[in-house]
Amino acid sequence: MEVSKAEQAIYDRQIRLWGMEAQNKIRNSKVLIIGGKQLGAEVAKTLSLAGVDEMHLVDHRLVDTEEIGMNFLYDASVDNSKMTKWAASYNFLYNLNRNVKLFIVEEDVLSKNDSEIEEYLTKFTLVVVLDESYERTAKVNNICRKHHIRFISGAIYGWIGYAFFDFDGHAYLVKAKSPDCLNEEESETGKTSTVVTVDEEFVLETFSYPSFVETLNSDFTAKKIVRKCKRIVPTSYFLVKSMLRASSENKLTGVTENDIEKLIPIWNEEVAAGNHTIDMQPVQPDRFDHLFGPNFGPTAACVGGVIGQEAIKSISEGKNPLRNLFIYTGFESTGFMCNFPPV
């Protein structure tokens, strides 16, 4: 299915940016987004504007009252509290781009047995898992790797957030320099004069990506890694990893004071494992309350923007995707791109 003339008029600017071939690939893509909170809203908006063929939006949870003023997809003039998160977002997304087919799934798809989950995931071009537990994210990632499906995950923890990318085995454009013209002239002295004109070209290259589990359990003990840990491992990584671990180990109760107490020893362990020192961490435990919400809007916007960018790049097989863990911290208004496990 190719982009119609009517769609060409709608997508004219982005077609000028990445070309008709890329837009056709986007037009034929089917995307699954699991998780309809702030981060999901940012990603869904970007992919809707890009013009994917289908977006399947999964979330069985009802809208929380505190979310209504934080999620721009919700209509604050109506009572959203009795609706599931994506159902409350439907009208905004439908009117944003009516060429995109929207499918709202109001059930907990990841609670099904493994064979049912696997069968469900195989029909998608890209799977995006947001604000989910470590175990569920890892399970979906393993299935996607098995079936060669592009995978992205991410989460927001108050003022910090992360995005993980796994495009293992997919090909993308990378820069390649080749001589366009070679002209050699012999001078009277016998020396060779060489004139070379180099044009910048792009070639397809297949990329290898580590899994979610491999990335989030990076080993920093190798001697050559220890020496450069303070340079390649951002301090915000330890906050993200600690939150993932606390959730995985069922340490979080929903009571912020208690959760901070449970988080501190985990954070201490992660900082030590990353060859950093506690006293050099810019975010100390007295600020850990910022990790438990409400989520910081600019953090969701930054992480969601990067996810949307890489999703489009991945689907369209564009230029050189990021590899492989992006972390944003609202404490310092800084984003870090990590290539983990480090080599």
UniProtKB/Swiss-Prot annotation:
Record text on subunit structure and interactions: Heterodimer of aos-1 and uba-2.
Designated name of the protein: SUMO-activating enzyme subunit aos-1
Cellular component aspect of the GO annotation: cytoplasm; SUMO activating enzyme complex
Signal peptide feature range: none
CDD domains linked to this entry: E1-1_like
Native source species: Caenorhabditis elegans
Disulfide bonds: none
Record-stated family: Belongs to the ubiquitin-activating E1 family.
Gene Ontology MF terms: ubiquitin-like modifier activating enzyme activity
Pathway(s): Protein modification; protein sumoylation
The entry's keywords: Ligase, Ubl conjugation pathway
Biological role: The dimeric enzyme acts as an E1 ligase for smo-1. It mediates ATP-dependent activation of smo-1 and formation of a thioester with a conserved cysteine residue on uba-2.
GO process terms (BP): protein sumoylation
InterPro entries according to UniProt: ThiF/MoeB/HesA (IPR045886), ThiF_NAD_FAD-bd (IPR000594), Ubiquitin-activating_enz (IPR035985)
